[in-house]
Swiss-Prot record:
It is found in: Cytoplasm. GO terms for molecular function: sequence-specific DNA binding. HAMAP family: MatP. The keyword Cytoplasm applies. It holds the Pfam family MatP_C. This is Macrodomain Ter protein. It comes from Photorhabdus laumondii subsp. laumondii (strain DSM 15139 / CIP 105565 / TT01). One of its GO terms (biological process) is cell division. The keyword Transferase does not apply. GO terms for cellular component: cytoplasm. The lineage of its organism: Bacteria, Pseudomonadati, Pseudomonadota, Gammaproteobacteria, Enterobacterales. Homodimer. Keywords: Cell cycle, Cell division, Cytoplasm, DNA-binding. The gene is matP.
């Protein structure tokens, strides 16, 4: 396993995931009968401050259809959590207008790179171009100074 599982933290994430799904109107319990489902959800709400007991609730009451989706969500959240600890693995998001994103995406695909790699290449290209322009300007200035002195 690449990332360490932290039971307390992940139980809290699972509780949050289940509550969010419940608020969105999804059936989070395996019960068809409304009263049993409401009782199970009420019990889950009480477990907010006891994250480890959430696992037992999941075993007893959770809708089995949610199992894989919840595992994937928790796995992704665990990855983001541990990646956020190190500067080089921390992810940031930026807002792009759709046409800009579309052009960047097409360029990335042509180059066979990720969006991040393509952005880095574009920045490096711009920096090299700027450095070259500065060198040419300096050479031009020096040449004008040399030619200007001889006259």
């Amino acid at each position: 396993m690449k990332y360490q599982q932290l039971e307390n933290l992940e139980c809290g994430w699972k509780w949050t995931y289940l509550m969010k799904k419940h608020q969105e109107g999804e059936l989070i319990t395996k019960y068809i009968e409304n009263s049993a489902a409401h009782a199970a959800v009420d019990k889950l709400i009480e477990l907010e401050s006891e994250p480890v007991r959430v696992l037992k609730w999941i075993e007893q009451h959770m809708n089995p259809d949610l199992s894989n989706r919840m595992k994937q969500t928790i796995r992704a959240r665990r990855k983001r959590h541990f990646n956020a600890e190190h500067q080089h693995t921390r992810k940031k998001s930026i807002d792009l207008d759709f046409p800009v994103w579309h052009r960047l995406s097409a360029l990335s695909q042509r180059r066979g790179n990720t969006l991040s790699e393509t952005i880095i290449q574009l920045i490096e290209d711009a920096e090299r171009k700027e450095k070259y322009a500065n060198q040419m300007s300096s050479l031009k200035h020096d040449l004008e100074a040399i030619l200007g002195k001889k006259e």
